[in-house]
Regions:
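Cys/His-rich short segments
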Residues: 143-190
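N-terminal alpha-helical interaction blocks
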Residues: 2-135
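Generic detector of bulky aromatic hydrophobic side chains
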Residues: 85, 99, 105, 109, ...
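Intrinsically disordered, low-complexity segments enriched in polar/charged residues with Gly/Pro
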Residues: 86-88, 135-136, 144, 180-182
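A gly/proline- and charged-residue-enriched helix-loop-helix capping module
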Residues: 117-160
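Aromatic-residue detector
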Residues: 1, 10-12, 18, 109, ...
């Protein structure tokens, strides 16, 4: 094999199931309160996650195969699951609704709820149950929502002084009110 052939990308290599995303996270918009308010009011879509980080998804088979999940149906055969996104309500974004990003169709937000609402055709599902079968947009939104809300839930206190931090930048930043330190989501290191 020549060195040129070895360095060429493999066109047939699939993307890892949970690394797909089409929504622009638009980091520059996270601190733009006027833009966030307009996006919430005019074209917002809301993803709800319960205390177990389950979401409502439409067309979820009882069993899906892929990413190490056993089942009877192969991902990609039959209708693909889709996240159940709600239209945002009200003029103001609730403080606990985090901004996930935007595309040409909508601005996407997520928030935690104690109990997911009842919905015809949708059932609660975990990321690991549906992630590999979701389309690119929904897979990216769900991975981002679970990661960001998990970080927010587990990083309440300042690691420097122990004070309760304040959520800023539409959920992508925590700031300590005592020492002013900023804390960003970061991957867990083992």
């Amino acid at each position: 094999m020549s060195s040129a052939a070895a360095s060429e990308p493999l066109d047939h290599a699939p993307s890892p199931a949970l690394s797909r995303a089409t929504v622009d996270r638009t980091g520059e918009r996270r601190t733009d309160d006027a833009w966030l308010a307009g996006a919430w009011r005019e074209r917002g879509r809301l993803l709800l996650l319960d205390d177990d980080y389950r979401v409502l998804a439409d067309d979820v088979p009882e069993k899906v195969t892929g990413a190490g999940i056993g089942g009877e149906r192969l991902a990609g055969s039959g209708p693909s699951p889709a996240l159940h996104l709600l239209a945002t309500e009200g003029d103001e974004r609730p403080d606990d609704a985090v901004f996930l990003g935007a595309d040409d169709e909508a601005a996407y937000f997520a928030r935690r709820v104690d109990v997911l609402p009842e919905s015809d055709g949708a059932r609660p599902a975990l990321l690991r149950e549906v992630g590999s079968a979701l389309g690119d947009r929904d897979a990216g939104l769900l991975v981002h929502a679970v990661a960001l809300l998990t970080w927010l839930d587990r990083s309440v206190h300042c690691p420097r002084c122990g004070a309760v931090t304040e959520i800023r930048s539409a959920g992508s930043l925590r700031v300590c009110p005592v020492d002013g330190s900023e804390h960003h989501p970061a991957p867990t290191r083992r």
